[in-house]
């Protein structure tokens, strides 16, 4: 069984990805930062379905924490050869009044965090000459949105990281891809007004928000052997929003 580490796996898309990967045969390290209870729920869901996993505390912006989390995962489950960089942060606000410290936190969480986790994962992947990396970006990286300059910049950076790294490591049996979800009903989007939510849905040809398992299914494919020729892709899962 291959081993994957999913960041931000205590809830939302991360939990859906962790459970879906476990159901498809991966051992899963449930990466989390704040809530022991959330991580426990994810792990219990994995194990109750017959999967194998472990929970690892992980602050993705802290280099030592990242190194320790991968060490724990390697010792508990085996060499980590799959990584889903899912943990993220978003806070909306117009640029002119946007606090610099929140801008920096957005970039640190969404870009630095993915960089540190990817660098750590590559140490094992390069030795085994096999690996799968999926970065959770956003359709905002393609179309932008007023009030989300920081978030859009960070998610666009993830696409750039994905495409550049795919050229660095593709010949080593490692693929790197990005998934770009549209609007989801998660804690990160709970702040949206009904008017804003209705606007997004109206712009989406399918006419609804995405389901978590729909995004997780794309991640599962990109992590599989069947996706061995998919590399450097940025795949929207947005109901046609960016068509």
Model regions and ranges:
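Conserved glycine-rich cofactor-binding loop
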Residues: 10-12
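Short, small/polar-rich loop/turn modules that mediate ligand/substrate recognition or access, typified
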Residues: 78, 170, 175, 230-232
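Substrate-binding pocket helix/loop in short-chain dehydrogenase/reductase
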Residues: 94-95, 99-107, 189, 200
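Active-site helix of classical SDR
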Residues: 118, 154, 162
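Alpha-helical segment proximal to the catalytic Tyr-Lys
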Residues: 123, 167-168, 228
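Residue(s) in the substrate-gating loop at a strand-loop-helix junction
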Residues: 138
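A conserved structural motif in NAD(P)-dependent oxidoreductases
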Residues: 205-215
